[in-house]
Design a protein with these regions (language model features):
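Active-site neighborhoods of divalent-metal-dependent phosphate/nucleic-acid chemistry enzymes
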Residues: 28, 57, 62, 75-120
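Short, well-structured N-terminal submotif of metal-dependent ribonuclease cores
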Residues: 1-42, 57-63, 129-139
Length: 139
């Protein structure tokens, strides 16, 4: 099994409008690796960074990012670290949470609550009845 860095996924997924020769070679190599049938491993942080790059750098809409991530995770040869937490995070993301906030909550399900000063995430998580509950610490 080969663990993949985020840049491999970005090259395989994103079609640059005017790619240079190096980008074209990297895209071909990334696509060849992903279509080889060999098992590949994605860490939680790679998935988190991929969401950020697609949304923040390439300015893809949330729905596009969600579709890309769900399609990627459905590929049989891809083994995902903490896959259940990633799927839960994608559901929170679909419902309007920031992906990182949704991922924090999904990975903290075993906790009684999560402390955060992010009032927007707190309000949305509460409205969606997500677990664990988010609490804003008081002085």
């Amino acid at each position: 099994m080969i663990a993949l860095d985020t840049n491999i996924l970005v090259r395989a997924i994103v079609q640059e409008s005017e790619p240079d020769a190096a980008t074209q070679q990297q895209r071909a190599a990334a696509q060849r690796l992903l279509s080889s049938g060999q098992a590949v491993f994605l860490t939680v942080t790679v998935i988190q960074e991929l969401e950020w790059v697609l949304r923040g750098v390439y300015r893809l809409h949330r729905d596009q990012v969600l579709e890309i991530l769900e399609d990627l995770l459905a590929i049989e040869q891809i083994v995902v670290d903490r896959a259940a937490a990633i799927m839960d995070a994608l559901e929170g993301y679909r419902q309007g949470l920031d992906f990182s906030d949704a991922l924090h909550l999904a990975q903290a399900r075993h906790c009684d609550r999560m402390a955060s000063f992010d009032s927007k995430a707190y309000q949305l998580a509460k409205a969606l009845s997500l677990e664990p509950t988010v609490a804003v610490p008081r002085a």
